[in-house]
Amino acid sequence: MKMQMKNSRLVVTGMGAVTPIGIGVDAYWNNLVQGVCGVDAITRFDTENLPVKIAAEVKDFDPLAFMPKKLTREMDVFMQYGYAAAMEAIDMAGGDDIASPERMGITVGTALGGIAPIGETQDGISTGLHKKVSPRFVPKIIGNEAAAQVAIQKGYRGPSLTVSTACSSGGDAISTACMMLLSGQADAVLAMGTESALSPLFILGLSSAH
């Protein structure tokens, strides 16, 4: 399949943001231009026995503002961030009238997927706190679930791809979306980058490589 690159124009019609310096595009941009710093003391878990006490943590995020309670139980935090940002972008771009479901694609970039549930579950098993693993465990750690949940909830049936290329995952998801459009595979593509790697396991892993 040949890409018709010459004279092709791709247009960004919507954006969404869930970040350490703001939830929502307006809040994020206003804080960005004002020089607000998102790095602060970690509050998600106890850091007493960890070598690192600070991180760029997303705070004041309420998933119920973006999805029903039942859906929050199906998603790890990285999926919730992506889903919330996706809903904002979709709404900004025109809602359900963006493209037909069959021609609506999704690309997601995530380096680690659900790394936090892996550490939490292993700790629970090792300490005897958990006698069995939740049936939601595997779906919560799979990187592609971020794209899948959006597609399921919105009824999109176009191409759905997940890119995992370390720190460039989000950028590569955008370039993959561009190629998807230029090749004619889709009329519109939701390009996402999402991560929630903040966990004791990840902190210890990075610290040991310092």
Report residues per predicted region.
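Catalytic metal-binding/acid-base residues of hydrolase active sites
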Residues: 195
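Short, high-confidence coil segments that cap the C-terminus of an alpha-helix
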Residues: 186-187
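Short conserved active-site loop signatures built around small residues
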Residues: 170
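Active-site histidine-anchored catalytic micro-motif
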Residues: 173
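Internal active-site segments that recognize and position negatively charged phosphoryl groups
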Residues: 176
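Short loop-beta-helix segment that forms the pyridoxal 5′-phosphate
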Residues: 159-165
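Conserved "HGTGT" condensation-loop signature of ketosynthase/thiolase-family condensing enzymes
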Residues: 1-158, 179-182, 198, 204, ...
